C-alpha cells in the first residue's frame, strides 16, 4: 500500500485518492452512515457492506453525549470520553483519518469537525461518500476489522464552538453572521419533522447544507462554494461567522465546505435549534426574511 502523503488530507478526498491507502496501518477509515429517526439504519448498512477496513461510528453513541434536559439532540461528547473512543479505534497523532457516510457528508463532517476540535488535523471526508465509492466500482467488505488500540490525548479548542448564550449575544449583531444549514421549509417554520418547535433564531440566515452538494453528493467546486458563502455572509468575516442546524450535525457540512473553499475560522453553534428551543423564553422567528 502507498505511504501516506507528507501533506495530510484535511478537507476532502476522492474515492480514487483513498483507494491506494486501503489497509494501511496508519490510515483509519470510519463509516458514519446514519439516518435520523432510524438510528439502526447506518449500522445495518455497514454490516451489509462497507469500504474494506472501515470501522463504524454511531452518531448517538460515538459522536455525541447523552441528551440532558438543557441540551440539544446531539450534545458534544466530553473530550476525555471521545479521546477514549478514538484510542479504542486505533488513533494516534500520526494517523490519517477518512470519514464517510452515504452521500451527503453530513454525518462524516460531524466526525471531521469533532476530530479537529480535539486537536487532530489529519482528517478528511470522502467526497460523495459510499455512493461515490461504489459508483467507482471499488470493492466492499462485510468484515469487521480488528485494530490495535492507539493512544490519543484530547486538546479541545474552545474557540471552535459557541454556546447558546454566546449565540444569543451575537445573532443579531451586524458584525456577526449566523447561518442555518436546515432546509428552507424548516428554517421558515413551515414544517418541523424533528423538533417540537418550528422556526429559526432571529438574525439567522438560511444556507441549506444541500446547496453545497451536487446531485451525486459531491461538493461543488471551491470557487462556487466560496461565492455562495460570501453571498450569505454579506461582508462578515469568516471568524465572525457561526453555523447551526437542528442539532449540530449538518452544520458541520457547512464548516467543511467553507474550509474546502479556503474559508477558515467559522464556528459551530453546537447545541443548535434543538437546544435553543429548550428554554421557552428564547425568541423564535418564522418566515424567510
Task: Spell out what each predicted region is.
Residues 1-289:
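Cytosolic catalytic domains that perform sulfur/thiol-centered chemistry
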Amino acid at each position: 500500500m502507498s505511504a501516506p502523503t507528507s501533506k495530510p488530507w484535511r478537507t476532502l478526498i476522492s474515492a480514487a485518492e483513498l483507494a491506494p491507502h486501503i489497509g494501511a496501518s496508519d490510515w483509519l477509515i470510519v463509516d458514519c452512515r446514519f439516518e435520523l429517526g432510524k438510528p439502526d439504519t447506518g449500522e445495518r448498512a455497514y454490516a451489509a457492506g462497507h469500504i474494506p477496513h472501515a470501522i463504524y461510528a454511531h452518531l448517538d453513541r460515538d459522536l455525541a453525549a447523552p441528551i440532558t434536559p438543557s441540551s440539544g439532540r446531539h450534545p458534544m461528547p466530553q473530550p476525555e470520553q471521545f479521546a477514549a473512543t478514538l484510542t479504542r479505534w486505533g488513533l494516534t497523532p500520526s494517523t490519517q483519518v477518512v470519514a464517510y457516510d452515504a452521500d451527503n457528508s453530513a454525518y462524516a463532517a460531524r466526525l471531521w469537525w469533532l476530530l479537529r476540535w480535539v486537536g487532530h488535523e489529519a482528517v478528511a471526508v470522502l467526497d460523495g461518500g459510499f455512493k461515490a465509492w461504489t459508483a467507482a466500482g471499488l470493492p466492499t467488505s462485510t468484515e469487521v476489522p480488528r485494530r490495535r488500540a492507539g493512544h490519543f490525548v484530547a486538546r479541545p479548542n474552545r474557540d471552535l464552538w459557541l454556546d447558546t448564550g454566546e449565540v444569543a449575544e451575537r445573532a443579531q449583531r451586524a458584525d456577526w453572521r449566523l447561518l442555518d444549514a436546515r432546509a428552507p421549509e424548516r428554517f421558515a417554520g413551515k414544517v418541523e419533522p424533528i423538533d417540537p418547535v418550528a422556526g429559526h433564531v432571529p438574525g439567522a440566515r438560511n444556507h441549506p447544507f444541500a446547496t453545497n452538494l451536487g446531485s451525486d453528493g459531491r461538493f461543488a467546486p471551491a470557487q462556487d462554494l466560496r461565492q455562495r458563502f460570501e453571498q450569505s455572509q454579506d461582508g462578515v468575516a469568516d471568524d465572525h461567522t457561526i453555523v447551526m442546524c437542528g442539532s449540530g450535525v449538518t452544520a458541520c457540512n457547512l464548516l467543511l465546505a467553507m474550509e474546502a473553499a479556503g474559508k477558515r475560522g467559522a464556528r459551530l453553534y453546537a447545541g443548535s435549534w434543538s437546544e435553543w428551543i429548550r428554554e421557552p423564553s428564547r425568541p423564535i422567528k418564522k418566515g424567510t426574511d
